Amino acid sequence: MFTSWGVETPRQFTEGTPIGIRMGFGAPFNKFTLCMPTWGDKTVSLTLSLYKWDNDFDTTRENAPVATKKIEKHPDNGHALLSFDEQPAGEYLICIDEFSGGRLGAWQMSAAVSNAYTYESGVEKPASWEISVSFTKTPVEPFFQ
């Protein structure tokens, strides 16, 4: 697992706005987790998906996801886990979508530690998130741009 550093702040997402995190993974991997606050709301549901990156946010989302999971009643600061068959090193999009039932967010890092790009409604924004990744082989560099 890769552990990030920096000051973390919970950031609330806007309901109905898909959130994307594009990252270059430096080794094969088979799961990731996001620690996601709900500010005490107990009925939050969301869909967590992984896509192989394809040119831009919209084109990527038109393709079938590598893996997807509907999460019901996500606990406050619970770890949203997505497991899948081993994927090769490369560029991917993590998508948080279809969330409802209360507030939902993620822990934003004070410094860019993963060379990630964040998308809100398809628009690229600067942000870095607390993400744990399970690599199946030891990476020389966990993440690349």
Enumerate the language-model features and the residues they cover.
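Beta-sheet-rich sandwich/jelly-roll-like modules and their strand-loop junctions
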Residues: 1-62, 73-145
